[in-house]
Amino acid sequence: IYDNRGISGEVQGVSWSNMLLTFQSQESLNVYSYATDDYFAFLEDNSGSNFSRDKMCLGVGRFPIRTVTEATQMVDKTISYMENKDSGSWKNNVTFVADDGNNEDSFTTNHMKQADQLAEAIEEMQPGFLVNKVYFDAYKRSSLGTYPDVHNEIEKLLKSGQLLINYTGHGSTTHWADESVWTQTDINNSSYKHLPVWVT
């Protein structure tokens, strides 16, 4: 849980007795601060003090659950994913989504360049993959300042099946970009047969 102090409405009334908090970096008020679970996988003696040098001894991850029912659903999904019964050409599809940035933050094209570098690396290393690019600036902006066609394209691609979806840009815990092209509500309301790996 990211809210170690319990100040957000999201964690009000949550029992803390069985919560495993994230590791928080020392520079917690700095722009270089971060939260990670990697710390819990540094099992060698004297490891864990240098994250760029130390090696994790096992893979770690979290299930965002609060109930036994949610835990059962997540375990069942993981087992299904690992059994790899849902094979098909969808596993050759990868999508890169890039924010447009703006003049105020001077990131006008940085996100697209970063996403393009990743996409080109995939195309070079794995030529069998079909790389989809959803870059905001390639779509029409609505009069409300949003990108409805970007949202629709992401949804269409997810329904067709993606091995990976990578987002490069600004966002928060509840949405991608200040235009909110993909939100927590979208995720909560979605149900896709093919489960991609999400990278943001």
Predicted segments, located by residue:
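Cysteine-dependent hydrolase recognition
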Residues: I1-T200
